[in-house]
């Protein structure tokens, strides 16, 4: 059975997306993760944005973009929100893992506003395909700006 990861696309008004760097990896990602028992997709996406970026988002501003095939064993349910541009240095990840040397490390260790044109190069292949081929980031932003 496929699992589903719930994520949020964090847009500013300047056609950039806030991406998070996965600690120990070479790629950038969006805040996302599995839903806790009894949690809706929107609740999981909001929680992941809070845990991985330190951002408390308005649940009423969240736009459900739908579910996308992400990997053979996992789907990706995406939400989008337009936020005031935050200083990436103020973002803080509050979820941790133990690395192979026994050190406690944050899941995300850096944050960056990324122009849409650079998303494909920064993200892992499957995420890049969802964000640049299955979605139009420009169209999503246009809808958010129009209040749809």
Give the ranges of each region predicted by the language model.
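A generic structural signal for short hydrophobic patches within well-formed alpha-helices
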Residues: 35, 119-120
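Short, charged/polar surface micro-motifs in flexible loops or helix N-caps
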Residues: 14-17, 24-26, 36, 72-73, ...
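The catalytic Nudix box helix
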Residues: 30-64
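Membrane-topology and secretion signals of cell-surface/extracellular proteins
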Residues: 29, 41, 55, 76, ...
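Functional cleft and adjacent loop/helix regions within the main domain
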Residues: 26-27, 31, 37, 78-81, ...
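A generic fold-level signal
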Residues: 1-3, 12, 71-73, 106-108
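Active-site-adjacent beta-strand/loop module that shapes the phosphate/pyrophosphate-binding cleft
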Residues: 68-100, 112-117, 130-142
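N-terminal strand-loop-strand
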Residues: 1-30, 79
């Amino acid at each position: 059975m496929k699992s589903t990861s719930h994520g949020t696309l964090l847009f500013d008004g300047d056609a950039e997306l806030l991406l998070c760097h996965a600690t120990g990896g070479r790629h950038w990602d969006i805040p996302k993760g599995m839903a806790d028992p009894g949690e809706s997709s929107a609740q999981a996406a909001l929680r992941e944005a809070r845990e991985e970026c330190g951002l408390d988002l308005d649940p009423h501003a969240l736009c459900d973009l739908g579910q996308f095939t992400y990997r053979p064993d996992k789907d990706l349910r995406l939400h989008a929100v337009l936020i005031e541009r935050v200083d990436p240095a103020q973002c803080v990840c509050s979820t941790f893992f133990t690395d192979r040397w026994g050190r406690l490390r944050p899941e995300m260790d850096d944050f960056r506003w990324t122009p849409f044109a650079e998303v494909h190069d920064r993200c892992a292949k499957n995420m890049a395909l969802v964000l640049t081929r299955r979605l139009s980031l420009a169209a999503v932003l246009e809808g958010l700006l129009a209040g749809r």
